[in-house]
Curated annotation (Swiss-Prot):
Residues at the active site: 98, 123
GO annotation terms (biological process): protein quality control for misfolded or incompletely synthesized proteins
Location of the protein in the cell: Cytoplasm
Protein name, UniProt field: ATP-dependent Clp protease proteolytic subunit
Organism of origin: Haemophilus influenzae (strain PittEE)
Pfam families named among the record's database cross-references: CLP_protease
Length: 193
């Protein structure tokens, strides 16, 4: 079990304590860490909508350290990132794999970055299903539709051809921060502020 640090802030009304993530949210920083799943996606969507309502003209920063996860949960975050008015700055800290890499690339063009030792990995969606042959066929068709959608969006955000994306996501494709920049997943590698 991890302990979340508390931050004490002095105000004209006295002291106020926040958990570190709430304090950073005041600075328009959202942490996307761990597996992308429904509960996490709902929290991130809520934070995005809250920050938009606070000031639709100021950028929102999403720090990503994720091994990936659920496509539908990730698409809820992605669609909200594209829907709201503020620009979204994405920054890979540690790793952005699978859906994490997709969300990293989905930031506002020119505002996507990675730290020097970050790792990025893209691949095709994973799926598994058991049951009747007709149900397996339905799920296989759905995974192919999802694969096409993800590849289309990656091509849009990276500037790579759909053919290149299909080839490069056929198997796990790991990249350094510099390689992710050359590929178009991020716009810069940040060394210092």
């Amino acid at each position: 079990m991890s302990v979340i640090p508390m931050v004490v802030e002095q105000t004209s009304r006295g002291e106020r304590s926040y958990d570190i993530y709430s304090r950073l949210l005041k600075e328009r920083v959202i942490f996307l860490s761990g597996e992308v799943e429904d509960r996490m996606a709902n929290l991130i969507v809520a934070q995005l909508l809250f920050l938009e309502s606070e000031d639709p003209t100021k950028d929102i920063n999403i720090y990503i350290n994720s091994p990936g996860g659920s496509v539908t949960a990730g698409m809820a975050i992605y669609d909200t990132m594209q829907f709201i008015k503020p620009d979204i700055r994405t920054l890979c800290i540690g790793q952005a794999c699978s859906m994490g890499a997709f969300l990293l690339a989905g930031g506002t063009a020119g505002k996507r970055a990675a730290l020097p030792n970050a790792r990025v990995m893209i691949h095709q969606p994973l799926g598994g299903f058991r049951g009747q042959a007709s149900d397996i066929q339905i799920h296989a068709q759905e995974i192919l539709k999802i694969k096409h959608t993800l590849n289309d969006r990656l091509a849009f955000h990276t500037g790579q051809s759909i053919e290149r994306i299909e080839k490069d996501t056929d198997r796990d494709n790991f990249m350094s921060a510099e390689e992710a920049q050359a590929y178009g997943l991020v716009d810069e590698v940040l060394v210092k502020r």
